[in-house]
């Protein structure tokens, strides 16, 4: 057997292997001989089928099996004796070996892990948002809960924020209707942000029974390419306006949220405690993402294996059920690159950089932090002790929690050398920033 490995562009390498024809033909002959005792062919006694008949019937498939086995065996053997560590199965191209008397020759293209060097850790400049929970924030949260349990009553009032509207509409672009631009008995809450800003503004001040036409500007990043950045014309008929009737914050309302006492002070305390937990969780997440963004900015040229990038995009596409939505393979792959390539590359780069930092620093898990986080998680459930017991008995959940804490310990170490400044934000602003973080 002869072999050679050639470096290609980026992280790719090409392994070329040639196995003599005699070795392949001998393996095929042995494969056919092994079939003889088990064959049942009309006109021949079991185990007595002539070799030339076996070869006529099974020669091609036997050769295919041998080629597959030899390619797999030789590839594994050569790679195991080399210094290469492929990141994914190779792409195989069979050059020769299809015919009897022909040597098996194939090429295997594979990628290796890139060299990882983390730069710029002493020059990280990060701005973090900060907020203190106020009584006003608690009041606004209670109002949000009231709106979630609101009733709606049909009214002859003019449409305003908070009202539930029922309407028919049709949109046109350059005088032509477009897909998704038509609705009948469409219902939504005005001011909720469910529709584009121009669409909601166009309905403000209308009364049931009125018709109105208005322009709607689509944003540049709108998912539909034929609408992105363009202005469409909409004609709307408002069929019904329903005014929002908020419930009183009374004993029955409070008990509906699990506060057994029905007491307003207990209710506010529970709301504040939950908001405090959510605020701290959001601040931790933002702190994490800002650090990762800063590290990636300093290491933007970190190369990633194409195989890993493709695998991550495929995984993300599966999460979005893209195969079922777009059966056409070519179109799906094009959309997959448009939607996921940037985030997939970011995830892989980050994984390589963080993996390197973990290897270098060998951080030991702080079990007191694990226990503290477990207490915090358990406190959000009706039976905290049962939750803690479940984490202690479920190995995977415990490992996942420890992985989060270990990452936070690394983050704390990296922040020790970073230049950090803070900007005052409201609770709502921090929650909005947190909501924009992907994955």
Curated annotation (Swiss-Prot):
GO biological process, one term: cell division
A molecular function GO annotation: protein folding chaperone
Domain (PPIase FKBP-type) ranges: 162-247
Any single Pfam family the record assigns to this protein: FKBP_C
Xref: InterPro entries: PPIase_dom_sf, PPIase_FKBP_dom, Trig_fac, Trigger_fac_C, Trigger_fac_C_sf, Trigger_fac_ribosome-bd_bac, Trigger_fac_ribosome-bd_sf, Trigger_fact/SurA_dom_sf
UniProtKB keywords: Cell cycle, Cell division, Chaperone, Cytoplasm, Isomerase, Rotamase
Keyword Chaperone applies: yes
Enzyme class: isomerase
NCBIfam families, alphabetized: tig
Record family assignment: Belongs to the FKBP-type PPIase family. Tig subfamily.
PANTHER family listed in its UniProt record: TRIGGER FACTOR CHAPERONE AND PEPTIDYL-PROLYL CIS/TRANS ISOMERASE, TRIGGER FACTOR-LIKE PROTEIN TIG, CHLOROPLASTIC
Full protein name: Trigger factor
